Structures are given as structure tokens and as C-alpha cells.
């Protein structure tokens, strides 16, 4: 019998709906193997604002702002088994979600 291990999964994405759907998919998969799940915990959103001039010549007062939001979620899996790890490896997530797994 394999030792039980704790797994921490960090999800990052620019789209909050995509990251929430991915988190629900992971939780459904893990709960089907019988492991205990804590989360998803929403972590602070990183917001980066870029300010650029609208025109190439004059009108310094005319500017435009763009922002990039980086959403993050944290999922802890407690008392996992080898079946849990296998099911997580088989899971397919959308390409817009970055997954970081720590055992």
C-alpha cells in the first residue's frame, strides 16, 4: 500500500471563467477517487496596467490604458492515493490554464 500524500495544485489564467471550470473539473475528478479536497481558494488577482499615448506626435494628455488580470486558484488534495494521481495525469484541461502541481 502506498503512503498517502498531500498534493497542492495552483491554477493560473487570464480568464476567470476558464479557471473556475477547470477547478470544478479537477475537484470532480479527485472526489471520484475518494480523496479529500480543500478549495478552490481564490488567491489575489494580479493586475498590471499599461498606459500608452494615443497619437504619435502631440496631445500628451490623450492617453489610453490597457490592463492585464492574472487570476489564481489554489486546490489542496489531502489523503490522496495512486488512483488520484493517475486520474489527475489523465485529465485534460483547456490550453488557457497554467497548472502547477506540488507533491
From Swiss-Prot:
One of its GO terms (molecular function) is tRNA binding. GO terms for cellular component: ribonucleoprotein complex; ribosome. GO terms for biological process: translation. It holds the Pfam family Ribosomal_S10. PROSITE patterns: RIBOSOMAL_S10. Gene3D superfamilies: Ribosomal protein S10 domain (3.30.70.600). The keyword Cell membrane does not apply. Involved in the binding of tRNA to the ribosomes. Part of the 30S ribosomal subunit. This is Small ribosomal subunit protein uS10. It comes from Salinibacter ruber (strain DSM 13855 / M31). The lineage of its organism: Bacteria, Pseudomonadati, Rhodothermota, Rhodothermia, Rhodothermales.
Amino acid at each position: 500500500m502506498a503512503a498517502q500524500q498531500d498534493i497542492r495544485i495552483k491554477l493560473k489564467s487570464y480568464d476567470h471563467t476558464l479557471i473556475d471550470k477547470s477547478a470544478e473539473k479537477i475537484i470532480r475528478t479527485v472526489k471520484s477517487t475518494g480523496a479529500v479536497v480543500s478549495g478552490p481558494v481564490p488567491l489575489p488577482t494580479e493586475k498590471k496596467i499599461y498606459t500608452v499615448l494615443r497619437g504619435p506626435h502631440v496631445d500628451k494628455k490623450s492617453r489610453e490604458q490597457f490592463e492585464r488580470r492574472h487570476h489564481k486558484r489554489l486546490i489542496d488534495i489531502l489523503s490522496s492515493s495512486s488512483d488520484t494521481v493517475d486520474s489527475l495525469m489523465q485529465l485534460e484541461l483547456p490550453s488557457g490554464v497554467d497548472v502547477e502541481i506540488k507533491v
